[in-house]
């Protein structure tokens, strides 16, 4: 995973959040501390779900989450939200009439602007490959799935 540079303000903010989880101030979040915070948010995770959360974040496998591990998680989440925002912006470029769907004509228009001369058949084929529900156009969820599968 590539490192995401966090600002000093972000690190300070994440340290404050970490301290909310770390009730006894020992520098690590235990399953019990995690449970307390999650339950305070009106969620009721099972013991297994709590252990799964810890295991996912706990890179040194000691059963707790230290601040460095918490920071890695937060950096990863920020990266994911940036990628989501980029996909939304890309979708808007294609969805000229902003109706929530990319039609064959909208796709063709964008491809021409990008210097790609596609036949109607090629454009239809591109729509067909991305159009999972078969309605003849590409909605945002289908667009995201298509973009993820490109990588």
From Swiss-Prot:
Under InterPro entries, the record lists: CALM/Myosin/TropC-like, EF-hand-dom_pair, EF_Hand_1_Ca_BS, EF_hand_dom
What is the protein's name according to its record?
Answer: Calmodulin-like protein 8
Instruction: Tell me one GO biological process term.
Output: response to bacterium
An example Gene Ontology molecular-function term: calcium ion binding
What organism is listed for this UniProt entry? Arabidopsis thaliana
Describe, from its UniProt entry, the tissues in which this protein is expressed: Expressed at low levels in leaves, flowers and siliques.
Q: Please tell me where Ca(2+) 3 binds in this chain.
A: 95, 97, 99, 101, 106
Give the binding site residues for Ca(2+) 2.
Answer: 58, 60, 62, 64, 69
Write out the residues that bind Ca(2+) 1.
Answer: 22, 24, 26, 28, 33
Q: What is the recorded function of this protein according to its Swiss-Prot or TrEMBL entry?
A: Potential calcium sensor.
Residue spans making up a coiled coil are none
Keywords, comma-separated and alphabetical? Calcium, Metal-binding, Repeat
Q: Which residues bind Ca(2+) 4?
A: 131, 133, 135, 137, 142
């Amino acid at each position: 995973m590539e490192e995401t540079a966090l600002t000093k303000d972000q690190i300070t903010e994440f340290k404050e959040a970490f301290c909310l989880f770390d009730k006894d101030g020992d520098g690590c979040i235990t399953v019990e501390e995690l449970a307390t915070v999650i339950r305070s948010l009106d969620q009721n995770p099972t013991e297994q779900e709590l252990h799964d959360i810890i295991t996912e974040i706990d890179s040194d496998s000691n059963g707790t989450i230290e601040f460095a591990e918490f920071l890695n998680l937060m950096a990863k989440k920020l990266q994911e939200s940036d990628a989501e925002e980029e996909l939304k912006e890309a979708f808007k470029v294609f969805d000229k009439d902003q109706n929530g769907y990319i039609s064959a004509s909208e796709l063709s228009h964008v491809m021409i602007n990008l210097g790609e001369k596609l036949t109607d058949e090629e454009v239809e084929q591109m729509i067909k490959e991305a159009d999972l529900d078969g309605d003849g156009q590409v909605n945002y969820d289908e667009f995201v799935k298509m973009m993820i599968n490109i990588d």
